[in-house]
Amino acid sequence: MNMKLKTAALLAAVALFATSASAETVLRLGHVWPESEIHAAAAKQFADDVAAATNGEVKIEIHGNSTLGSDRELLEGIKFSSNDIWVGGAGVLSTASEAARIFTLPFMIRDVNHYNAVYGGPVGGEITKRIRDESGYEVVAYWLRGPRWLTTKVPVEKPEDLSGLKIRVPDSPVTVQSWNQLGASATPMNFGEVFNALQQGVIDGQENPLSLILSSKFSEVVKYLVRTEHAYEPVVVVMDAGRLAAMPEDQRKAIVDAANGVAKAYASDEVQKGEQTFVKQLQDAGMTLIEPDKKPFQERVGTDFVHKTFAPVADLYDSVAAVEAPNGQ
């Protein structure tokens, strides 16, 4: 990050919080999801818990459904105080940090146990530190998000079936390059535009966790649900590192504890429970389930691809692969 920006952000943070401990601090939290989405509910829980822990001294105002902008705009807005907290898919951080490219590398995380071992352990700590050093953003918490699935208007059973298909992806360099490598025409787009783009034929498909596919009613505009489970991208709670550090210690602790407390547990529980029912609900809504052999997809975007295309995070990728999860998974 530009040193002038770092200094300006820190000075602004110090000025903002150089008030009496009893003064109310209002923080604006932005996300792109509808209220019914699991992580939107988790964000509300987080805000409620911060208010309770600080006796109302810190109030978090939630602005969901892209009302403050796209994920990238929300992330960048943290530096200019148009919003203070962003909750969203971690891959968007890759626009500001090389280390954040790790989040959306395809087929890197093996399962939920592996996910928890990675982001709850030393490797997760190293990822957080590198993002802070490179960008000035502080990842306050990692929330579980189910694996990403592909939804399309035509059947996809092998990589060759992706040829010529415009697949909406988040604004993440890793995701764009990975889907292009798989054979698709990756199309970055603000999430709030996806439903209409599918409806109007601007794109041929999209990829997201089941919870978001369901809550966004994509079953109304695409027919095929493809079990690729190609990425376990975390949802992250992000603030400006300097601003968080400048807050009174009790308020800073309340934010960190709340982000890693009930809200995080709620998201994890709901995602894992939902995985058992979301597929059936989507099938009941008219979608056709396709369960392809994942190996041909994995081979196109495996270790050789990562080391060649994303060399700055190859060491982190190897560290993640070496993490052993409980129960030998």
Kindly give the residue locations of the regions a language model identified:
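N-terminal secretory/targeting leader peptides
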Residues: 7, 12, 24-115, 122-329
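Sec/Tat signal peptide C-region and signal peptidase I cleavage site
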Residues: 16-23
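Generic C-terminal helix-cap and adjacent flexible tail
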Residues: 2, 19, 325-329
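Positively charged n-region of N-terminal signal peptides that target proteins for export
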Residues: 1-7
